[in-house]
Amino acid sequence: MKEFEKASLILSPLRRAVQNYGMIEEGDKIAVGVSGGKDSTALLCALALMRRFYPLKYEVVAITVDLGLGMDYTPIEKLCADIDVEYVRVETDISKIVFEKQSEGCSLCSRLRRGALHTEAERLGCTKVALGHTKDDVCQTLVMNLFYAGKIEVFWPKNTPDGRNMTLIRPLIYTTEKSVKEFCNKNALPIVKNNCPMDKNTVRQDVREMINEAEKKNKGVNHRIFRAIEKMGIDGFSDFGE
């Protein structure tokens, strides 16, 4: 199996999240949703690597939901071969559906992608679906919902979606975007270029830039937002201390 440098950047916070929230159980078959971006690719590599020493035995399979945007996932397929992980690509026409209904845009795309991912994971007999949302994503989601929807809400670290027989987990919730970037760069991990015309032109991107600017003026803003989420117990988060 491929060796990784600076693996502790990802493995240490990932293992802590997995243990704190009981994300992995003996005999799990975990489907990692791999978009080809840095977060999901780093998550895939970390979960594959952790199989070596984690006390509970589990399997990993990588699933890419191809939106029909002409993106080349060959590098991800090769990476999966290098780390001994089964790779499955699901072809869809989601992009066509989404751009015919532009009023719903990104939210519709997200729902359709998630549905296709869960359906394929169920077909493969998986017990868990892992997504690559980071600590930064948690904070951005809170600010987005507060500013644009008038509610205090984030996504759950671990939950079972309605109508599904498997658990959704987010093992990177303690991992910063900065650590993910450093890990990916250090190991020259393949990142698939996103051909979506909405990439970098979303509300989330605006909020990301807003928080980054606040971080420059007042270091630790991101971490304090995250700690507030934990202390308030929002959507399944718990306060396990610093």
Name what the model sees in each region:
Residues M1-Q140, Y148-K151, K178-K186, G236:
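ATP-dependent adenylation/nucleotidyltransferase module used to activate substrates
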Residues V60, R113, D136-K216:
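Catalytic subdomain that performs nucleotidyl-dependent activation
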Residues K96, L131, N195-D199, V221:
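Short, surface-exposed helix-loop/turn micro-motifs enriched in polar/charged residues
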Residues K38-T41, L67-G70, S103-E104, M144-N145, ...:
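Short amphipathic alpha-helical patches
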Residues L67, T92-I94, I173, C196, ...:
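Residues that form or immediately flank small-molecule/cofactor binding pockets and catalytic motifs
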